[in-house]
Amino acid sequence: MDMRVPAQLLGLLLLWLPGAKCDIQMTQSPSTLSASVGDRVTITCRASQSISSWLAWYQQKPGKAPKLLIYKASSLESGVPSRFSGSGSGTEFTLTISSLQPDDFATYYCQQYNSYS
């Protein structure tokens, strides 16, 4: 009897093995902030372990899907205004809006996509 497991299936099974996947906790601060048009705004995101530069920032408005702003920590998604910028690597990252505009009032999220250590 052939006991070999297809590589694709093995990969899926590994996701369910306790301890096989690293739990990376993300902490964003501040949780809320007050700002006015023209303000410089900085949001910080910290990872519980190094994720290199595998971090994305999203903007979400009520009733809308999240919009990708920044990927790989500092790369600006096409069409996103240059007042948005991202920086950082390892465990600490920042999203900066250089001059807040009325259209920028929204919820912002960071997301890591380094699933394995």
Swiss-Prot record:
Framework-2: annotated span: 57-71
Cellular compartments annotated: Secreted; Cell membrane
Residue segments, region Framework-3: 79-110
GO cellular component: blood microparticle; extracellular exosome; extracellular region; immunoglobulin complex; plasma membrane
Source lineage: Eukaryota, Metazoa, Chordata, Craniata, Vertebrata
Domain Ig-like: 24-117
Role according to the record: V region of the variable domain of immunoglobulin light chains that participates in the antigen recognition. Immunoglobulins, also known as antibodies, are membrane-bound or secreted glycoproteins produced by B lymphocytes. In the recognition phase of humoral immunity, the membrane-bound immunoglobulins serve as receptors which, upon binding of a specific antigen, trigger the clonal expansion and differentiation of B lymphocytes into immunoglobulins-secreting plasma cells.
Name of the protein described by the UniProt record: Immunoglobulin kappa variable 1-5
InterPro entries recorded: Ig-like_dom (IPR007110), Ig-like_dom_sf (IPR036179), Ig-like_fold (IPR013783), Ig_sub (IPR003599), Ig_V-set (IPR013106), IgV_Light_Chain (IPR050150)
GO biological process: adaptive immune response; immune response
Recorded superkingdom: Eukaryota
Keywords of the record: Adaptive immunity, Cell membrane, Disulfide bond, Immunity, Immunoglobulin, Immunoglobulin domain, Membrane, Secreted, Signal
Leader sequence residues: 1-22
